[in-house]
């Protein structure tokens, strides 16, 4: 079962971690988050109950177009397009072109695991703040 690991960290922490990785000073471990949000609130907005339900419908029904997904969900194509593009930026969904330019959504993970620090997080590869 594929699980996407998500973490919460400040912009400054994410930047420092990325630079440490780019310089070769830090190599992320296999179990570390692959996707980062700057707050639990931003994570909750992207993966709201409605959007998690949308991911479930995509995973279960495998719609071959946004038009079909709109039929299954009762949502407008324009709304779906915006939502899916946002989720694609975070890796929650993959969008590919089908026949005649249709957009085919796919969910590459069965689970999403959130690492939520209870104290000020210190990312591996960053200096102590």
Language-model-detected regions and their locations in the chain:
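Short acidic, hydrophobic short linear motifs in intrinsically disordered regions
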Residues: 63-71
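Short amphipathic alpha-helical interface segments
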Residues: 50-63
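Short alpha-helical segments that sit at the start of domains
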Residues: 26-53
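Short, cationic-aromatic polyanion-contact patches
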Residues: 44-48, 65, 95-121
């Amino acid at each position: 079962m594929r699980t996407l690991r998500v973490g919460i960290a400040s912009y400054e922490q994410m930047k420092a971690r990325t630079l440490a990785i780019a310089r070769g000073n830090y190599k992320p471990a296999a179990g570390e988050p692959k996707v980062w949000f700057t707050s639990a609130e931003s994570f909750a907005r992207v993966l709201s109950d409605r959007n998690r339900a949308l991911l479930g419908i995509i995973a279960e029904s495998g719609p071959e177009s946004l038009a079909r997904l709109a039929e299954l969900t009762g949502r407008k194509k324009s709304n779906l397009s915006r939502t899916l593009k946002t989720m694609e930026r975070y890796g929650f969904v993959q969008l590919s072109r089908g026949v005649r330019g249709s957009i085919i959504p796919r969910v590459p993970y069965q689970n999403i695991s959130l690492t939520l620090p209870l104290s000020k997080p210190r990312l591996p590869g960053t200096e102590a703040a």
